[in-house]
Amino acid sequence: MAVYTDIAEDDLKWFLTEYDVGTLLSYKGIAEGVENSNFLLHTSKAPLILTLYEKRVEKSDLPFFLGLMQHLSARGLSCPLPLPRRDGALLGSLSGRPAALISFLEGMWLRKPEAKHCREVGRALAEMHVAGEGFELKRPNALSLDGWRGLWEKSEARADEVESGLQGEIRNELDFLAAAWPKSLPSGVIHADLFPDNVFFLGDELSGLIDFYFACNDLLAYDVSICLNAWCFEKDGAYNITKGMAMLEGYQSVRPLSGEEIAALPLLARGSALRFFLTRLYDWLMTPEGAMVTKKDPLEYLHKLRFHRQIGSAAEYGLSL
């Protein structure tokens, strides 16, 4: 979450008259994340999250995101729920941006996740994949192979400012993945961004998943690889196989991976590491000065990409074959 667009209190109060949420008591911006402008609101009825959708988010995608949260919640997944306006619409407008009110989810994200938490995340990810079955709206993954190349073209000229020699290395990686990427693995709705700050816990119990604004239709095992990258490396860059084993066991307790998915996991992990390297690289180079947003180091994901190149089997991630 982040803040790119400021809001005036009077405009916010007028916006809230379209909802049955009581009167505004206080509000503040939330700096974490990189995509939309987010605010924590306290009203006389309940705390809420206000999201203003910025230019990177296509307005035509918003029915998918908001509808998906409704669909998953109705099937028992703990996640935020968009609040309807008095006219029944889920989307309004504030400060020149499409805007929505979202229910507040209790919990905190973990700064130092342990293996037991990774097991819960794996289980919750599989539960989301199963709950997503039957969701009728479709959204292609804008940050898959074609999207990676487009991002790279915007950043390539300045890439060596981050590390010398990056241009040739990333060009070669893109070409390799384009030729080797699997096409026929099981697919469905994926979260595509299930990092620790998008998973809330109350104590050691997972209380819910948030931030579905990268969700799309893609390979389910690709979503697993994103979580391995996001949860199972230590601050020094080392892969923690105990966390990986726990996450994969948790996932497979709900939805067992097929043999083809298991064989493809190292390749998928290379792809997901490259995806987050490229978006971080773009944001690192292009984010405007003064934006209330937390930029993230792209080199973290370059090191993960290089790690996955050395992996010969999913067993090296902790998967029991």
From Swiss-Prot:
Fetch the Pfam families from UniProt. APH
Query: Secretion signal: which residues?
Result: none
Q: Does the keyword Transmembrane apply?
A: no
* Enzyme Commission (EC) number: 2.7.1.39
Pathway, per record? Amino-acid biosynthesis; L-threonine biosynthesis; L-threonine from L-aspartate: step 4/5
One MF term in the entry's GO annotations:
ATP binding
Keyword set, alphabetical order: Amino-acid biosynthesis, ATP-binding, Kinase, Nucleotide-binding, Threonine biosynthesis, Transferase
Please name the top-level EC class of this enzyme. transferase
Query: What catalytic activity does the UniProt entry give for this protein?
Result: L-homoserine + ATP = O-phospho-L-homoserine + ADP + H(+)
Annotated family = Belongs to the pseudomonas-type ThrB family.
Q: What is this protein called?
A: Homoserine kinase
The UniProt gene name for this protein comes to thrB
